C-alpha cells in the first residue's frame, strides 16, 4: 500500500514520465484515499517516516490536515495523529547541531498547519495543556522564566509559525464565517485569554530580548508578526508597557526587521481604545520622531513605503481622536483639551513627516499618506469650511471657525506638495502611455480631491495658490509644465462649475475665480510657445480644455473666434503628424462648433473650408478577410463634415453656395464609383462612406440653421430654411436615389441611403415626398434582411410623424401601404421557413425556464423566433405611428381596405410563444385597443384625424371585431396551451391590456346598459360565454362590471376574475 501511494504521488506530481491518462487515474485514486478514513494511519506513517522525501512528507501532511479539517476522523484517530505530530515536532527540534535549514520552510509551515488543525479540534476539551506541552516539546520553556540563550531556535521557529496559524484560524476577519464557526472562534479566544495569552506574550518578549536582531532576523520577523496579529484581540496592556514598547521599537534600527517592526507597530497603534488612552499610547511610542530619524537615510523603497504607512497610521489614529472628541455631546473641557493635544501632535509632528513622504520620488510611497490626509481634511471641513454649495452637507455641518495660522500653513504646504506631485515625472516620455495613465488614476486624481477639499475649506487659499502655480508655469518651455498648467486650469474651471467657493449663483459669472479663469485662458491662447510643443499630451489636453470650458473664452468678436479655429486647423491640431492627436482634434472641433454655433460671414467660411478641404476626401484602404476596413479614419472624418455643416448652416449671409465646395468632390467620387465596371468591395464601401458623409453634413447644416430647442419644429424649419438650400438638398436626394438604384443589392448602401434620407427630411419637409416615394419603392424591390426591414419600418414611422398633416404624405402611404405590408409578410414567411428548417432548436436557440407556480414553462427560443419577434415589434411600431399621428383613416380608404384584413389578423392572432414576449405583446395589444377605439364601429372616429370625415363607414367591421376580439380576450388567459399565469408580472400586464380591449369594444359597440342594443354585450351573453360554459351568474356579474366600471376598476375586476378561475 505504501509503495502504491508513493508511486501515485510520483505520477500525479509528474516526477516520473507518464501519459495524461495515467496522471488522471493517479489523481482520482489519490482523491479516493483522502476521503477514506482508513488511509489516515498510512499517511501519518509517510509523514513521520524518515525515508519519505520532502514531496512525500508534504503530501502526507496535506492529506492529514484536510482530513482533520473535514471532520471525518474519530476521537481515537485524532489522538493518534496528535501523538504522531508531537513525535514529529520532537524529531525536528532534536536535529543535530540545531540546523534550522535541515527542513525546508514549506515543510515547517505545513507541520505548523497540522498542529493548528489539532489545536482547533482538541484545545477546548481534550488538549487544554496545548501551549504548555508545546513549549516543552519545542524546548523553549526557559523563555517563560527570563531572556536566555538556552532555548531551541528551531523550536521558537515552529512555535511562531503555529501562533500565526492559530490567529489566522480563529481571528482573521478577511473571510466571512458562519455564525456557528464564529462562535467557536470567539470561545477559543476567550479560553486562550484566560489560560495562555500571558504565556505567549512572555515567550515572544523574552525571545526578542534574547536574540541578536542582525543574526536571527527571521525569528524577530515572526515574533513581530505574532504580536501584530494578536494585538487586536488580547489585552493591550500585556504588550504596551514602556519596556516592551522600547524593545519592539528598537527593531526599527535594523534594515532586516524595519518593515516587520513597522507593520507590528501599525497594528499596535490601531488597537481600539478610549481617546485618552490612545493619545497616551501614541505619546509613549513617539513614533514620528523615530521615523523622522530614518527618513533621509532609507534607500529601500519597500522600507520607505512601510515607514510612510506607519507615519500615516499615527496621523490616522490621532484624527480618529479628533473625530471622537467632535462627537462628544455635549462637549466637555476634557474632550476639548484632548482635541487640542491631538491636533497639535498632528500639526507639529505628523504633518511635516507626511508631507515629506508625499514628495517622495516613488508614487508607491506617496500613496501611503493619502488615507491620513483625507481623514484630516474631513475633520478640517467640519471645523473651518466656508465654501461649498449653499445647502450642501459641508456648508450645513461646518462650524465655520476662524482658520488659525498653523492650519493655514498646513493647507498651503499641502497645496504646494500637490502641485509638485501632479507634474508628470521627468523619466516619462511621450511613449510612457501606461505609466502616465497609472499615475493619473492613482496619484493625480487623489491629489485633485485634496485640492478641491482645500477649496471648500478656504476658497481664498486655494485660489491664491493655484493661481500662483499656473502663473509660474504658463510660460515654461517644458511640455510637462504646460500639461500641468492645462490640467490645473481644468481643475480651476471645475471648481467654479461645481461652486466649491460657495458663491451665490447670480455672482459666479462675475466672481474673482471666473475673472482669473478668463485671464488664464486668454494667456494660454496668446502663448505661442504652447503651439510649438511637440507633445500629444499638451495638444490633446489643450483642445479638451478649450472645448469643455469654452464659456471662459471672452471673445471680443469674429476675429478672436477665427483665431481659435485657425489653431484647430493647424499642425498643432487637425493636421497633426500624430494620428491620435489628429483624430481627437477632429472630434473636438465638431463638438466645439455644435456647442457654440458661431456665426461667420461667407468670406470667413471660404477660408475655413479651404483649410479643412485636404482632410475631406474619403478613401477606402485595405479590407481584411471579413470585408471590414482596416485602420479606417472615416468615422472621425464624419466629425469634420458635422463641424463644417454647423458653420455653413449658421453663416450670417444666408449663402449656401459654399456647400458646393464640399458636395462637388463627393458627387464626383460617387459618379466614379457608379461608373466603375466592377462592384468591388472597396467601391461599395466608398459609396457607403460618401452617403453617410452627405447625411451627416445635411443634419449639421440644419442644426446650425435652426435653434437647438426648435430642431424638430417643422414650422420653424420652414421659416428659416431658404429655397436655395432646399434645392441643393433636393439634388442630394436625387443623387442618393441614383446611387441606391445602382447598388441596391448591397445592404450597406441601402442602410446609408436610409440614413441620409432621414437627415434630409427636416430640411426638405414635404418636398421630400416624391423622392421618398422612389426610395420606398426601391426598398420594397430589394432583398431586405430582418434588421433592415425593422429599420426601414422605423424610417416610415418617422415619415408619418413628420408629414401626417400633409396631403401628399397621406396619398403616398395610401398607395404604398399594401406593398409595405406585403413585404413584411414575405420576410415573416422567410423567417418561418428558417425556423421550420431548424431540425434541433434546442441546440440553435436558448431555453427559457419560466417555471412559476402551477404552470412550469420550458420555452425554446430559437434564433428564427427571436428574429420574427424583432420584426413584429418593428411592424407594430409602424402601425402604432398611424395611431399616435392620427391617420388611422389610412386603413379605411379604398386601398387601405384591401390590406386591412391582413393587418387585423396580425394584431389578433398569437402563438403561445408570442404570449411570453411582453414588449411585443404590450405594443401589439395597444395597437389593437386603439384600432378598436378609433374605427371599431366601422367609422373613423378620431377627432384629430383630418381625413376622417372623407372616409365612408366600413360596414361589418364592428361585427368582425366582436367575433374576433371577445374570443381573444378569454382564450389567452384561460386556454391551457397559452400557459398564462396572471400571478407573473408579464401576464398581469397582458391581462390589464385585455381588460382595456374588452371595455373599448363594448364602448365602440354603442355602450349603454341594454344587452339587446349593444351587439358586444349580446354576443358575450348569448353566444360566446354560454358556448364556453361560463357560469351564468358570472356572465351577469361580468356584464354588470363592464357597464358600470371605469377603466381602472374594470381592470382590477378582470384581473381578479382570471386569478379566481386559474387558482
Swiss-Prot record:
Location within or outside the cell: Nucleus; Cytoplasm
Isomerase recorded as keyword: no
GO cellular component, one term: nuclear matrix
Keywords for the protein's UniProt record, in alphabetical order: Cytoplasm, Nucleus, RNA-binding, Transport, tRNA processing, tRNA-binding
Predominant location category: nucleus
InterPro entries to which the protein is assigned, alphabetical: ARM-like, ARM-type_fold, Exportin-1/Importin-b-like, Exportin-T_C, XPOT
Matches recorded under Pfam families: Exportin-T (PF19282), Xpo1 (PF08389)
Any one GO BP annotation for this protein: tRNA re-export from nucleus
Keyword Zinc among UniProt keywords: no
Molecular function via GO: small GTPase binding; tRNA binding
Annotated function: tRNA nucleus export receptor which facilitates tRNA translocation across the nuclear pore complex. Involved in pre-tRNA splicing, probably by affecting the interaction of pre-tRNA with splicing endonuclease.
Family under the similarity heading: Belongs to the exportin family.
Protein name: Exportin-T
Natural source organism: Candida glabrata (strain ATCC 2001 / BCRC 20586 / JCM 3761 / NBRC 0622 / NRRL Y-65 / CBS 138)
